[in-house]
């Protein structure tokens, strides 16, 4: 009996293990869900430095405002109360403006205010005589720059994916890694704070448990997308995603650990989160690899990430709470969970709550629309092969069980020939009743010694006067 039912039972257990039930749905996260968890918490970081340059081109002091210096990078909410992590080098031009930036703004001002006037006096149109123009420009810079005064107005801003822009305050700063003598080298992290009390947030993963080959996804705002002439303005507020794997564990020039990945990255991705397969931050993109030569193009496949454990260490003496929780995130994660288990109504309720907390996030709007559409027009459900397999297995098991029960009922008093032999060997010879049908008994020469002949007809009509030793077992031979 055990052998007969072993196969159906095993099949049922295997099918049940693969069944789409509440427990399995709650413990697994698809790549799509993981990335949607992360995207709303990723922000564009802008470091801007405007300048007021006072100079004298020969006609008295004048104030010039050269074009604003601007660099962009990526950041992400580590605390839903407005705390953002990015790279130190992303905000460095605005946080600690370097000397070269002061000189650059001064030179731009001199070129803008003075060069055209001098060329005009010499009867030269700008661009007409490049060689003469370059010589005049060099003389002007030598003459005007020493008395030029530059006032810088640095500012760091953050743009969330709804397009809302916030002025950010740098609350903690660690300079970028450097191998130049005399240049301070740090962890290349910066902690920003923007006004507001409710934002998306990303949880931190444990970077120590990462292994080579683990999937990794980099989110950010690469400049090639921000400046793409064929994309509209929405590209500047929605994070792009690249995918790869952990490809190594290295140390930078100051012996600090970094994670190597082959996930593609570009200028503008700096400071962006590198998330794992559950959407938690495994690290922060910090630097890429450049080809040798003056152009120094990026060599993809060799990018590096600051481990999340370094982020924990960086913010431990601040007001940041590393909980990975906010009201928005709770509603957003629940909505995604319900959406991917096809509970469209519950998903829509959570998405609506998330949209009220942080309005107009593109991913929220998009998936809320999908949930509402699925409520109105439910998508076709796949054929329930799982339950068909379960029922077929159960019916097969019932059939096997019925056959076994019938056979057991018929044979419940049957004794095997080996049992008879054991009785004979043990000196407990049974009384053998030969109850074969008459035609079989007469046709076959086999006769059992010392047996008692009893035809089936006699059994049917009732037997009287049959004397048997009641202390001996009785075996009926019918085949």
Regions found by a protein language model. Give the residues of each.
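Catalytic nucleophile loop of clan PA
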Residues: 76-77, 211-212, 264-285
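N-terminal activation segment of mature serine protease catalytic domains
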Residues: 23-83, 87, 95, 186-190
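Catalytic cysteine-centered active loop of the rhodanese-like fold, especially the PTP/DSP P-loop
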Residues: 463-479
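Flexible, gly/ser-rich surface segments that form the specificity/activation loops bordering the active-site cleft
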Residues: 70, 158-185, 201-259, 266, ...
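C-terminal subregion of chymotrypsin/trypsin-like serine protease catalytic domains
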Residues: 88, 92, 99, 105-107, ...
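Flexible, polar/low-complexity N-terminal or interdomain linker segments that lie immediately upstream
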Residues: 380-443
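Conserved catalytic-core segment of clan PA serine endopeptidases
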Residues: 33, 101-197
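Short, aromatic-rich amphipathic segments at membrane interfaces
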Residues: 362-386
């Amino acid at each position: 009996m055990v052998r007969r039912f072993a196969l159906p039972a095993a099949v049922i257990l295997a099918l049940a293990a693969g069944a789409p039930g509440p427990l399995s749905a709650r413990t697994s996260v698809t790549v799509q869900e993981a990335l949607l968890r992360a995207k709303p918490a990723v922000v564009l970081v802008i470091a801007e430095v405007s300048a007021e340059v006072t100079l004298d081109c020969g006609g008295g002091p004048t104030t010039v405002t050269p074009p604003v210096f601007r660099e962009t990078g990526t950041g992400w909410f580590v605390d839903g109360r407005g705390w953002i992590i990015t790279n130190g080098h992303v905000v460095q031009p605005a946080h600690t403006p370097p000397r070269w930036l002061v000189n650059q703004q001064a030179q731009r001002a001199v070129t803008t205010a003075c060069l055209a006037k001098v060329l005009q006096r010499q009867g030269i149109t700008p661009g007409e005589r490049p060689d003469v123009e370059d010589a005049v420009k060099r003389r002007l810079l030598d003459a005007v720059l020493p008395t030029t005064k530059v006032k810088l107005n640095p500012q760091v801003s953050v743009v969330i994916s709804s397009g809302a822009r916030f002025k950010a305050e740098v609350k903690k700063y660690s300079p970028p890694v450097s191998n130049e003598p005399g240049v301070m080298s740090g962890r290349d992290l910066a902690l920003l704070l923007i006004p507001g009390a409710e934002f998306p947030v990303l949880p931190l993963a444990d970077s120590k448990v990462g292994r080579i080959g683990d999937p990794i996804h980099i989110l950010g705002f690469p400049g090639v997308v921000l400046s793409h002439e064929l994309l509209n303005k929405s590209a500047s507020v929605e994070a792009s995603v690249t995918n790869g794997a952990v490809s190594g564990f290295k140390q930078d020039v100051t012996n600090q650990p970094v994670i190597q990945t082959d996930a593609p990255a570009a200028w503008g991705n700096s400071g962006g989160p590198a998330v794992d397969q559950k959407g938690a931050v495994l690290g922060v993109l910090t630097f890429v690899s450049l080809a040798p030569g003056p152009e120094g193009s990026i060599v993809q496949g060799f990018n590096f990430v600051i481990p999340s454990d370094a982020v924990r260490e960086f913010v431990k003496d601040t007001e940041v709470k590393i909980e990975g929780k906010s009201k928005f995130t709770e509603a957003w994660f629940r909505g995604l969970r319900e959406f991917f288990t096809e509970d469209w109504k519950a998903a829509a309720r959570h998405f609506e709550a998330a949209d009220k907390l942080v309005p107009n996030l593109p991913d929220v709007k998009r998936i809320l629309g999908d949930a509402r559409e699925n409520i109105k027009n439910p998508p076709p459900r796949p054929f329930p092969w799982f339950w068909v397999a379960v029922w077929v297995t159960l019916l097969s098991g019932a059939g096997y069980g019925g056959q076994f029960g019938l056979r057991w009922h018929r044979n419940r008093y049957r004794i095997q020939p080996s049992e008879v032999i054991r009785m004979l060997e043990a000196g407990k010879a049974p009384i053998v009743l030969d109850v074969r049908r008459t035609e079989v008994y007469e046709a076959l020469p086999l006769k059992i010694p010392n047996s008692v002949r009893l035809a089936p007809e006699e059994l049917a009509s009732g037997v009287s006067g049959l004397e048997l030793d009641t202390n001996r077992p009785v075996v009926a031979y019918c085949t």
